[in-house]
Amino acid sequence: MFEHAGQGYAGHGTLCGALGVCSCLINLVIYDKNFTYAAVIDRMMWWYAQMHFPTERFDNISNFPGQIKAKAMTPLCHTSVSKWTLTAGVKVTSKEKYERCAKVAGEVVFTVVHYLNEYFAGRWTPAKWTPSEETTQCIECHGPETYQRYANEDGLNHQQGHMECLLCHPDHMKALLTKRPTK
């Protein structure tokens, strides 16, 4: 049913397929008037971005236990996988990479089931996304006003998202930092 989500949706390397599939499932089972599903999905996304994958959870059933880990930094498949393959020194078409992604998918599902159990037991407390200092500086100018404490009122209001800006825009930040007065 969700085979199309593999390799970042039909090989495009966009959103990690495990995140997309779990987002659909979260939406199906936690659709309420408070839009709690969005908070659960948001938490899942930034949890993923902060994780060092693959974990050891599935090593006992793995052909490649003890694989090298790399921090995902983003929910994007191509970034997460590329960082890992470069760190591990393997090709994107290797059996090691496919095993890594299977472990990541299992870890995402395991974590989402934990979140859902918290929700249905009445213990769910949504954590709030907190951007890095660098991303906060980007949001001050580019973010929508709905990022209340991060964006200023006269911001450009043409950026949305909770990803780290520097992953794709490192030169922009360098230029910004050279123009700012030092403290």
PLM-predicted stretches and their roles:
Residues M1-E3, K83:
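Acidic-glycine-rich active-site phosphate/pyrophosphate-binding loop
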Residues A5-T14, T93-K97:
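A short glycine/serine-rich beta->alpha loop
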Residues Q148-N152, A175-K179:
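Short Cys/His-rich "knuckle" micro-motifs
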Residues M1, L28-R43:
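Phosphate-handling active-site elements
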Residues C22-I26, I41-N117, W124-W129, T136-I139:
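Amphipathic alpha-helical interface segments
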Residues A10-C24:
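Conserved phosphate/anionic-ligand binding catalytic regions in large, soluble enzymes, centered on
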Residues T136-E145, H162-D171:
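The canonical Cys-X-X-Cys-His
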Residues E153-Q160:
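Short linker/helix segments within small regulatory modules
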